[in-house]
Design a protein with these regions (language model features):
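Short, small-residue-biased leader/transition segments that mark boundaries at the very start
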Residues: 1-4
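Binuclear metal-ion centers of metallo-dependent hydrolases, dominated by the metallo-beta-lactamase
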Residues: 25-27, 118-134, 213-273
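Pre-active-site segment of Zn-dependent metallo-hydrolases
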Residues: 33-72, 76, 80-88, 166-195
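Active-site neighborhood of phospho(di)ester-bond hydrolases with catalytic His/Asp-centered motifs
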Residues: 42-44, 67-81, 97-101, 161-164, ...
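Active-site environment of divalent metal-dependent phosphoester hydrolases
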Residues: 48-50, 76-81, 104-108, 130-132, ...
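Active-site-proximal loop/helix segments of hydrolase catalytic cores
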Residues: 145-222
Length: 273
C-alpha cells in the first residue's frame, strides 16, 4: 500500500473538500480500479494475455456479489477493452458498463461467444463531446486523438479523469502535417478541462513515443488542476516516471505525478484527502 503524499494533501487541503474513502489500484497498462465508499469504478480492463507479445499480470480483486461496479471502456483496442468483462454480470448483478460506441456487441455476436445478450441492458454506449448520467455518476466524454473517448467522471464528491488514448501522439516519420493536426486536436480537448476540478487523473506516458514521451503529459499538467496524476499506457516500463519527475523544476508539479512501480499496486488516500 502506498499512502499518497500526505504533505502535499496537507498543503492543498484548504482548496478542496474531503471526499471520504478512496483507494486506487493500478491493475496494469491503462487499467485502474477506484474504490469509493459505496461503489467501484474500473477503467479499461483487459485480460493480461490478450495483447500479442505482452504478458500483463494485474488481476481484479473480488467483491461481494451485491457490490455496485461500473466498468468503463474508452475504445475497442485490445489493450483497453476485453469482451470477457461482460461475463462479470453473472457474478455481479449490480454491474453497469459504460462503453465507447465503437465497441460492437450485437445480440448475435454475444450469443456466438456464449454471453447472454440480455447483458446489453446493462450497457450505456457513449460518444465524444456528450454528458451522461448513470445512477449517481455524472460522465462527460472528450474526443480521443486515436479512438473512442476520454472520461471525466464525478461521484461521491470525487472528480476523476481517464484519458483513454487521448494524447499528443507525435511519431517520428508521421510528418509535421499529421503530428500538428493531432497536437491541435489534443490541446483543444484538454482545454475543455481547464476549469474542471480533477482530484485524480490517469494519463498516457507511452515510452514508444521515445523523445516525445512526455509532451502530452506536460501539457496536461500545465493546463489542468489535476491534483494526483497517474501515468499509464507504459507497456510495463515505469522508468520514465522517475526521469520525468526529476526533469520538473517545479516541486509541487512533480508531487502531483504518482510513481508507479508494479502491477496491482494499491494507493490509499490518507485522512487529509
Amino acid at each position: 500500500y502506498t499512502t499518497l503524499f500526505r504533505s502535499f494533501a496537507e498543503r492543498e487541503k484548504k482548496k478542496r473538500k474531503r471526499v471520504g474513502y478512496m483507494q486506487i489500484i493500478f491493475i496494469h497498462h491503462s487499467c485502474f480500479l477506484v474504490e469509493l465508499d459505496d461503489k467501484v469504478l474500473i477503467f479499461d480492463y483487459f485480460d493480461g494475455d490478450k495483447v500479442e507479445g505482452m504478458h500483463f499480470t494485474g488481476k481484479l480483486p473480488s467483491y461481494e456479489p451485491d457490490t455496485k461496479i461500473y466498468m468503463f471502456a474508452s475504445h475497442s483496442h485490445k489493450d483497453h477493452y476485453d469482451m470477457d468483462i461482460l461475463r462479470l454480470a453473472d457474478k455481479y448483478p449490480n454491474i453497469h458498463y459504460i462503453f465507447s460506441k465503437d465497441i460492437r456487441i450485437s445480440p448475435h455476436f454475444l450469443s456466438k461467444h456464449g454471453i447472454d445478450p440480455a447483458v446489453r441492458d446493462k450497457v450505456t454506449f457513449v460518444s465524444p463531446d456528450n454528458t451522461y448520467h448513470v445512477d449517481d455518476l455524472d460522465i462527460m466524454t472528450l474526443r480521443s486523438t486515436d479512438a473512442g473517448v476520454a472520461f471525466y467522471v464525478t461521484s461521491n464528491g470525487v472528480s476523476l479523469f481517464h484519458a483513454g488514448d487521448l494524447n499528443d501522439w507525435e511519431w517520428d516519420g508521421a510528418g509535421d502535417l499529421i503530428n500538428g493536426r493531432v497536437r491541435r486536436a489534443f490541446r483543444h480537448e484538454i482545454k475543455k478541462l481547464s476549469e474542471k476540478p480533477i482530484n485524480v487523473a490517469f494519463f498516457p506516458m507511452d515510452p514508444k513515443l521515445m523523445e516525445y514521451q512526455f509532451k502530452g503529459f506536460d501539457f496536461f499538467l500545465q493546463n489542468t488542476s489535476a491534483e494526483f496524476v497517474f501515468p499509464m499506457h507504459m507497456w510495463q516500463d515505469y522508468s520514465g516516471i522517475t526521469e520525468y519527475k526529476k526533469r520538473l523544476s517545479n516541486k509541487e508539479m512533480a508531487d502531483r505525478v504518482i510513481e508507479i512501480e508494479r502491477e496491482n499496486q494499491t494507493f490509499a488516500f490518507g485522512e487529509n484527502y
